């Protein structure tokens, strides 16, 4: 039977069937195995098991046979499933398959999975954890920041959780206080809140109200608790008993409880003004309180964990209570706008109610009443074996209503109703097909998840045709049963109406344009129609969608075709903007690349939806209407615009789509402003449209063409122009723009004219708008040049003549050849001065300009972010700085050294990849921009550094890891690393000082084998070090204590893991050793050393957080850190290694003389009898008089970081090893793999000091020092243990990891040959040496070098000496650093239990941002202003090539300086964002701020016009001050008497000020006057220039060098400009887009984006990083003088111009074709 069930036949069995059968037998779930047994015993139809056939094939006992076929001769699957679960031993196959240890191809307990580890320490089963994981990742993926934090979780659980309890509930889950809930915390919290015993559930509630986590509810916390409990209780369905309950009654009950708790009847300390509860009192009050206020909250949290977090109910009756309780609570709340409710057909709801309400006497949950549930442990499991397999299994088993109906009909035919006796059948997936109508567009993709069209022919009634459930409850039912057709509906609030549920949203058809056939023959319609995605949520909810293929543009204009692409449902209150944004997110489009059109059903035309803020109802869009989604082409053209052009030119119509405007209230009331008309994009012509729009809004030029004055000045004979074509086409387009009533026009004729006369702008590519503008102004000027015949002129050399004469001469010659309105408005004059550095000769030249091209500052800096990882295990710190791109990594080290005070030669700069050190960057390498923000710098150990150290945690390794992990220091540091990272930097100095003052002494810098004497004192009076004596006494418990497993604890072990003999040792120890004990004394030392209770201070070597380097004791000997020999070393054999410090003291660190090294196995230690106070006194009294005393060097502190004195010798880098984190996971393909497990790397590699003579235990201690912050600490006591934090008691006696020797890849062994398939030989935690002098010497010149090498001393690790020859060892001294990593690496193999339960992955890449990060980032993107660019433009620069000096008669070095001599009325500023760098054009994204009003370019004028303006302003201010002085002379008199400085100010004024003494006046006037006189007292320094000496500025004889036509009241010497237009370029160089902003004649600002034109605020927000062209107009400019006088003039003969028009029309018609 088994062979046949697996697919075997007489001809054999296929491999696929055999494999599936083995997987089912070994890995199948209980439900799958039950279904497998059903298929073995059922009939051929697979519907029933016949009693006669079953008894014949299976030898059943009478009892089992009667229990199975008691009601009928045949049973269905549901009946068989219930029976076989209860009688697993009924048959041989069921006993074999359904037992816990059935068949296993590999032992699951060799490497426990994450599920097994969590199941072992929580009240959850492995399947529960798997279900929670699915929901956890779904929630995490929907979060915006990828984390389940309070901001994300709040809207999901509140309501029903009260808002004032939201933070407390979140903190109860967030045990490590990192601000988000990880999966382990979720499982532990759900276990404690739902599956734990009543005591644990109550303790979880206590954590909700204990906000400060001090174990006591303060008065405020107690009042908050009462408010929450009352609010939840009154929302409960059984709220009658809580209806009249008030806050005062609860407080009274608490006071009575406190009185009962008082010993001997003494008065309670609790009062109404001071009500507080301890954790014990809280739990007793919840049990003894008659109010039972805690039960509603417990029920709410119980429901929350099932509904929101994804926990499955343990039985169907529990499911009924959860669903009904959640639904009743939600129904009592009013509708909220935006809330989604889901429709469920009433038939399915009834079947579910019957299934879940059916109770039996066998279910323990059903036997409990509401009053009993508070006293009975709610973690009991229903004996009915509620089927909780996945939704996919439901489908594969073909269960549901169909099976139930078949069973009923069969039973009815035999006269026995099986359904009546076995109970209702589990309902199948939710099927709402009877609520909706048939979809006529079944083959069209739906973008929204509305589910379908509800029936309208028959009215649907709630509670009769359908039921409504909230979104959260629907998701839970969907997880448990599945669904075929969700029907979400949204709550809306129409204007002037109440909220309502919108059952019938608008179902719209979305049309797209059919792609024009390309050369490949693939149309866009097929591609768009083939998109597929899974839609989740309701209509309007985001869903994943495909991309969009850009529509190709045919070279022949023709109307685009439309086709039905999608359907979507939207609320009738949705706005056009919301619809557009939804479609963009669904189809991955940009909002600026789409437009929406309404296509009426009986009309082929389209109406553009311009009103973004109007809703669909206001736009008269009805159900089943059509919306056209227009997608802009790749060349930035709009298909509808091109189609309208084709239609118009072919005679089919004369209007554009924009002509049709919907007559809405806003469109009727709005007036189409003149000039507010867009321009069609004719194929990447945005550069032309933007330039034209700003010229159209240049008011004097616009008036010139609007009045048709150009027709009197067209110069068709000018060969340098376009024969008047451009001027005529430009005028026609300008007139059309300013008089059009349509929203956009097509600049076709002007485009053809530009292509003809400027072929460089032809084609479909993108061009530079500035280049077009410059050509356009020049071509318009030539077409309108009033000079018919240009005279010949030759520009003379300045030859030392005054600038005024040379400039007038140059402008006169230019004006004689060029006279037009373009010259009058846009042209100015630049002064160019070249100074010879050899003789000082100056050559001045004046040239006209139409726009100023200002180069942007190009900074050749690279921004670096470097993460510094220290050896002390502190939180890494990230630094930021900027370096020149030509620098090397040696400069980076020195720059970083100034920030973190870490010596450059103690830095290892490297790049990480895949949790490994990919490459070490040498000092002489040039900086790379690719890894600028991903650099890691490790602190290298000093040559004398020891490894077992951590003063911050006071780590005494002999004390045992259990007590270390429970120490308050570790708990505090672990919490502070998450909750106080923002203050870590500022408090680092205080922490360093505090630790240094605790009396810890660092080790001594000693080389060789030596012994340190006990009489040690300090020789530096300023030293903070005081030697201490650390003692430790064990409690003697050790291994002598044997704890008996309690009965309930044994049941927990049996429930979680089955039989004990199958459990792994570590997990069994955790389950059995539940009572904490201290570690045995000999855990980390040998027996002889264990008898010694005193521990020397020199054994415990400390480093401080953020320490750059310290002096460490260098040990050697058999037991380097456990040696207790006390024979002193002669002080004469020590050599001083540190010089005198600046305070007069001396750092007397000594080293042993190399000549005295005898190679003896001797240790050294400090005496254990020194007193701290005596040592301090001796150090202060005998500072300089004890030359034979030994002390440690004291590093100075600065902001918590040690800084070295300049007098100290350079630090020498020591040897080190690289360690990588590794976890062992079960191999997925265990059938084919040689190994059952596979290693994988994770986290950030470590750098482990490996000094000479170090032991394996030193390696373990050094690793523990750096990884201890990544583990969640064990609670200090068992009373403080949380629900699942104390994961494994066995970890207290050992490190939670194992070190192994591997290769650089971290996966294979570095010792064994590849054929052994070894994953790395274990490095045991003992006192064997790691190194024995086999390493080559460290190259002093290289700072990033190390040569790790291991010499094994135990049999399990072979000796590495056989692999190394002397030649090979010597060569390693000169091998690059990366070579060393290829030989030997340490793999940190984490214990699976510790990795799963205590390792905090969020801390792996946690760092603290140094203040330099913000400073450097700000400097990197620091903006500049327009003045900065103008200063750079007018500053003097040295010429790269030598200049031919006319005076020296040869080439000489020279400088050049540009300045503005004459300002134009319209000043165009060009910001040069496009530059050629190394042969490639790049765009600068530099932020340039520019003024809108009162832009004064005076500082950038040449000296003569600049001094003229400044002197005029100065005299004007003096005149104003004099007038004010005359009016308030009395005030001046009083001020002179009071304030002496005012007298000095008055004496310095010139005589023409006319200041006299005056009487007193009110104080405000006197203050203003005094400030004004003080300001003017400091006379302006007049400009000094050779030009001013030749052209002096005479007061009263000022000359206006700009000659602007201004209005009468405007000062001609106040050249202030206002911004009226901007051209912006967004995107990259080759694929960007131009838009323009302009202010029209009324002062309103408009944004012109091709055919789109919209009004914006008065001062538009323009991206300063995209501004490209700035247009300024002189304030007070009078337009009339610039316009020619045409009175009495006749039009010239322009007969030749219309001929060109006909030619243009002909070219245009060639593009039209009728398809």
Swiss-Prot record:
Highest taxon of source: Eukaryota
Domain DUSP, first and last residues per copy: 314-492
Domain EF-hand: 161-196, 197-232
Active-site feature positions: 686, 1633
Binding annotation for Ca(2+) 1: 174, 176, 178, 180, 185
EC number: 3.4.19.12
Binding site for Ca(2+) 2: 210, 212, 214, 221
GO BP terms, alphabetized: protein deubiquitination; proteolysis
Annotated Acidic residues bias: 1171-1180
Pfam family, one: EF-hand_7
Top EC group: hydrolase
Calcium among keywords: yes
Alphabetic keyword roster: Calcium, Hydrolase, Metal-binding, Phosphoprotein, Protease, Repeat, Thiol protease, Ubl conjugation pathway
Low complexity bias spans: 408-419
SUPFAM superfamilies: Cysteine proteinases (SSF54001), DUSP-like (SSF143791), EF-hand (SSF47473)
Compositionally skewed regions (Polar residues) per UniProt: 1103-1126, 1150-1164, 1188-1209, 1550-1559
Residue numbers spanned by region Disordered: 393-429, 1103-1213, 1536-1569
Domain spans labelled USP: 677-1675
Database matches in InterPro entries: DUSP-like_sf (IPR035927), EF-hand-dom_pair (IPR011992), EF_Hand_1_Ca_BS (IPR018247), EF_hand_dom (IPR002048), Papain-like_cys_pep_sf (IPR038765), Pept_C19_DUSP (IPR006615), Peptidase_C19_UCH (IPR001394), Ub_carboxyl-term_hydrolase (IPR050185)
Catalytic reaction list: Thiol-dependent hydrolysis of ester, thioester, amide, peptide and isopeptide bonds formed by the C-terminal Gly of ubiquitin (a 76-residue protein attached to proteins as an intracellular targeting signal)
Record family assignment: Belongs to the peptidase C19 family. USP20/USP33 subfamily.
Role according to the record: Deubiquitinating enzyme that acts as an inhibitor of mitophagy probably by counteracting the action of park. Possibly functions by hydrolyzing ubiquitin attached by park on target proteins, thereby reducing park's ability to drive mitophagy.
Entry protein name: Ubiquitin carboxyl-terminal hydrolase 32
């Amino acid at each position: 039977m088994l062979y046949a069930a697996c697919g075997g036949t007489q001809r054999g069995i296929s491999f696929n069937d055999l494999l599936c059968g083995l997987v089912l037998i070994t890995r199948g779930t209980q439900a799958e195995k039950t279904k497998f047994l059903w298929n073995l015993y059922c009939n051929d139809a697979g519907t029933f098991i016949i009693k006669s056939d079953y008894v014949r094939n299976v030898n059943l006992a009478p009892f089992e046979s009667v229990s199975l076929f008691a009601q009928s001769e045949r049973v269905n699957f549901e009946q068989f499933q219930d029976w076989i679960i209860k009688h697993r031993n009924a048959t041989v196959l069921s006993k074999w398959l359904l037992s816990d240890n059935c068949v296993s191809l590999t032992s699951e307990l060799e490497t426990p999975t994450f599920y097994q580890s969590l199941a072992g320490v929580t009240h959850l089963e492995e399947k529960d954890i798997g279900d929670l994981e699915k929901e956890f990742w779904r929630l995490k993926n929907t979060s915006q920041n990828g984390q389940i934090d309070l901001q994300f979780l709040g809207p999901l659980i509140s309501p029903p959780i009260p808002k004032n309890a939201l933070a407390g509930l979140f903190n109860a889950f967030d045990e490590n206080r990192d601000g988000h809930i990880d999966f382990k915390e979720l499982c532990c919290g759900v276990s404690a809140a739902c599956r734990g015993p009543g005591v644990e559930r109550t303790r979880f509630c206590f954590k909700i109200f204990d906000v400060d986590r001090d174990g006591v509810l303060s008065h405020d916390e107690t009042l908050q608790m009462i408010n929450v409990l009352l609010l939840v209780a009154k929302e409960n369905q059984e709220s009658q008993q809580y209806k009249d309950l008030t806050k005062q009654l609860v407080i009274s009950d608490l006071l009575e409880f406190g009185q009962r708790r008082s010993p001997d009847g003494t008065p309670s300390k609790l009062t109404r003004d001071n009500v507080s509860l301890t954790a014990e009192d809280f739990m007793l009050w919840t049990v003894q309180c008659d109010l039972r206020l805690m039960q509603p909250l417990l029920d709410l949290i119980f429901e929350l964990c099932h509904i929101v977090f994804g926990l499955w109910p343990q039985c169907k009756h529990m499911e009924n209570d959860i669903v009904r309780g959640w639904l009743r609570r939600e129904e009592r709340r009013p509708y909220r706008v935006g809330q989604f409710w889901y429709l469920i057909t009433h038939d399915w709801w009834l079947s579910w109610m019957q299934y879940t309400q059916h109770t039996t006497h066998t279910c323990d949950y059903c036997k409990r009443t509401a009053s009993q549930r508070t006293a009975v442990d709610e973690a009991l499991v229903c004996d009915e074996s509620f089927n909780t397999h996945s939704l996919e299994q439901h489908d594969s088993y073909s269960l549901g209503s169909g099976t139930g109906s078949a069973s009923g009909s069969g039973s009815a035919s035999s006269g026995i109703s099986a359904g009546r006796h076995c109970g209702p059948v589990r309902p199948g997936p939710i099927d709402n097909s009877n609520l909706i109508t048939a979809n006529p567009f079944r083959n069209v993709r739906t973008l929204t998840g509305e589910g379908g069209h509800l029936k309208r022919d028959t009215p649907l009634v709630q509670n009769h045709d359908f039921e409504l459930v909230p979104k959260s409850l629907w998701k839970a039912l969907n997880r448990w049963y599945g669904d075929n057709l969700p029907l979400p509906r949204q709550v809306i609030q129409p204007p002037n109406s109440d909220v309502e549920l919108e059952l019938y949203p608008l179902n719209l058809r979305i049309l797209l344009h059919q792609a024009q056939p390309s050369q490949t023959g693939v149309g866009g319609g097929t591609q768009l129609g083939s998109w597929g995605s899974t839609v989740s949520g309701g209509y309007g909810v985001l869903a994943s969608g495909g991309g969009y293929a850009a529509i190709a543009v045919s070279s022949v204009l023709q109307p685009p075709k439309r086709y039905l692409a999608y359907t979507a449902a939207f609320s009738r209150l949705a706005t056009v903007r919301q619809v557009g944004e939804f479609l963009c997110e669904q189809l991955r489009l940009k909002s600026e690349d789409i437009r929406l059109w309404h296509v009426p059903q009986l009309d082929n035309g389209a109406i553009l939806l311009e009103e973004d803020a109007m809703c669909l109802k206001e736009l008269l869009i009805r159900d089943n209407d059509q919306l056209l989604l227009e997608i802009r082409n790749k060349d930035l053209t709009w298909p509808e615009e091109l189609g309208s052009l084709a239609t118009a030119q072919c005679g089919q119509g004369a209007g554009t789509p924009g002509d049709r405007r919907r007559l809405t209230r806003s469109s009727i009331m709005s007036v189409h402003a003149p000039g507010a008309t867009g321009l069609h994009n004719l194929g990447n012509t945005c550069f032309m449209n933007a330039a034209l729009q700003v010229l159209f809004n240049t008011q004097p030029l616009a008036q010139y063409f609007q009045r048709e004055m150009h027709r009197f000045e067209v110069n068709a004979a000018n060969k340098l122009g376009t024969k008047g074509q451009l001027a005529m086409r430009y005028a026609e387009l300008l007139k059309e723009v300013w008089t059009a009533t349509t929203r956009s026009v097509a600049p076709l004729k002007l485009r053809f004219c530009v292509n003809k006369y400027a072929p460089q702008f032809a084609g479909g590519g993108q061009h530079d708008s500035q280049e077009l503008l410059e050509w356009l102004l020049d071509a318009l000027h030539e077409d309108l040049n009033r000079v018919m015949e240009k005279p010949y002129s030759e520009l003379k050399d300045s030859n030392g003549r005054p600038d005024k004469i040379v400039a007038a001469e140059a402008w006169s010659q230019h004006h004689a050849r060029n006279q037009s309105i373009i010259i009058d408005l846009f042209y100015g004059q630049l002064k160019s001065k070249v100074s010879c550095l050899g003789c000082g000769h100056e050559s001045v030249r004046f040239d006209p300009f139409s726009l100023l091209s200002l180069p942007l500052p190009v900074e050749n800096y690279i921004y670096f972010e470097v993460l510094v990882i220290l050896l002390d295990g502190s939180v890494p710190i990230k630094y930021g700085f900027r370096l020149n791109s030509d620098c090397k990594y040696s400069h980076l080290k020195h720059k970083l050294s100034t920030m973190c005070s870490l010596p450059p030669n103690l830095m290892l700069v490297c790049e990480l990849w895949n949790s490994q050190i990919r490459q070490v960057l040498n000092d002489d390498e040039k900086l790379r921009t690719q890894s600028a923000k991903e650099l890691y710098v490790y602190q290298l150990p000093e040559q004398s550094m020891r490894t077992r150290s951590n003063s911050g945690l006071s780590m005494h390794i002999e004390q045992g890891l259990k007590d270390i992990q429970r120490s308050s220091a570790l708990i505090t540091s672990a919490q502070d690393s998450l909750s106080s990272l923002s203050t870590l930097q500022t408090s680092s100095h205080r922490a360093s000082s505090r630790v240094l003052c605790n009396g810890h002494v660092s080790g001594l810098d000693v080389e060789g084998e030596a012994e340190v004497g006990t009489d040690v004192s300090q020789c530096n009076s300023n030293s903070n070090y005081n030697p201490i004596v650390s003692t430790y006494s064990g409690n003697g418990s050790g291994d002598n204590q044997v704890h008996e497993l309690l009965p309930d604890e044994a049941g927990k072990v049996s429930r979680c893991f089955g039989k004990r003999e199958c459990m792994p040792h570590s997990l069994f120890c955790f389950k059995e050793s539940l009572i904490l004990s201290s570690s045995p004394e000999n855990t980390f030392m040998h027996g002889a050393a264990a008898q010694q209770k005193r521990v020397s201070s020199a054994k415990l070597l400390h480093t401080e957080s953020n320490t750059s380097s310290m002096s460490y004791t260098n040990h050697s000997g058999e037991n380097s850190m456990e040696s207790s020999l006390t024979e002193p070393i002669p002080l004469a054999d020590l050599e001083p290694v540190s010089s005198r410090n600046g305070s007069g003291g001396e750092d007397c660190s000594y080293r042993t003389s190399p000549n005295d090294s005898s190679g003896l196995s001797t240790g050294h230690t400090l005496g254990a009898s020194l007193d701290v106070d005596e040592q301090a006194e001796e150090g202060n009294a005998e500072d300089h008089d004890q030359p034979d005393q030994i002390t440690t060097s004291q590093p100075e502190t600065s902001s918590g970081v040690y800084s070295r004195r300049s007098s100290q010798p350079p630090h020498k880098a020591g040897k080190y090893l690289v360690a990588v984190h590794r976890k062992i996971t079960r191999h997925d393909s265990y059938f084919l793999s040689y190994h059952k497990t596979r290693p994988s790397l994770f986290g950030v590699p470590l750098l482990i000091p490996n000094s000479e003579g170090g032991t394996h235990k030193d390696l373990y201690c050094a690793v523990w020092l750096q990884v201890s912050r990544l583990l969640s600490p064990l609670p200090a006591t068992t009373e403080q243990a949380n629900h699942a934090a104390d994961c494994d008691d066995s970890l207290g006696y050992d490190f939670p990891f194992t070190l192994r020797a591997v290769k650089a890849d971290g996966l294979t062994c570095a010792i064994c040959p590849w054929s052994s398939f070894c994953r790395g030989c274990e490095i045991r935690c003992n006192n064997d040496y790691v190194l024995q002098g086999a390493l080559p010497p460290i190259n002093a010149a290289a700072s990033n070098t190390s040569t790790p090498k291991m010499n094994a001393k135990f049999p399990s690790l072979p000796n590495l000496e056989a692999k190394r020859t002397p030649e090979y060892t010597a060569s390693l001294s000169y091998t690059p650093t990366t070579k060393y990593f290829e030989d030997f690496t340490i793999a940190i193999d984490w214990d699976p239990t510790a990795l799963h339960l205590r390792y905090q992955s969020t801390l792996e890449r946690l760092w603290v941002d140094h203040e330099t990060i913000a400073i450097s980032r700000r400097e990197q993107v620091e903006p500049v202003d327009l003045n900065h660019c103008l200063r750079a433009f007018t500053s003097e620069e040295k010429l790269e090539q030598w200049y031919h000096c006319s005076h020296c008669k040869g080439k000489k070095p020279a400088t050049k300086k540009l300045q503005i001599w004459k300002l134009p009325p319209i000043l165009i500023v060009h910001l040069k964002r496009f530059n050629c760098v190394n042969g490639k054009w790049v765009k600068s994204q530099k932020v340039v701020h520019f003024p809108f009003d009162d832009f004064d370019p005076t500082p950038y004028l040449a000296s003569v016009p600049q001094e003229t303006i400044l002197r005029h302003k100065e005299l004007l201010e003096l005149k104003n001050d004099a007038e004010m002085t005359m009016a308030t002379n009395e005030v001046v008199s009083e001020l002179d008497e009071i304030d002496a400085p005012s007298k000095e100010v008055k004496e310095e004024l010139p005589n023409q000020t006319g200041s006299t003494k005056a009487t007193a006046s009110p104080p405000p006037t006197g203050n203003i006057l005094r400030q004004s006189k003080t300001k003017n007292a400091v006379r302006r320094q007049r400009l000094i220039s050779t030009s001013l000496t030749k052209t002096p500025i005479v007061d009263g004889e000022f000359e206006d060098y700009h000659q602007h036509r201004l209005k009468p009241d405007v000062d001609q010497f106040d050249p202030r400009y206002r911004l009226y237009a901007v051209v912006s370029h967004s995107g990259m160089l080759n694929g960007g887009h131009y838009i323009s902003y302009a202010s029209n004649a009324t002062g309103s600002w408009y944004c012109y984006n091709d055919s789109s034109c919209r009004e914006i605020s008065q001062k538009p927000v323009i991206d300063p990083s995209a501004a490209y062209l700035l247009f300024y107009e002189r304030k007070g400019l009078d337009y009339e003088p610039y316009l020619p006088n045409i009175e009495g003039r006749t039009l010239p003969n322009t007969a030749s111009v219309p001929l060109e028009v006909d030619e243009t029309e002909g070219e245009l018609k060639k593009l039209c074709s009728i398809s």
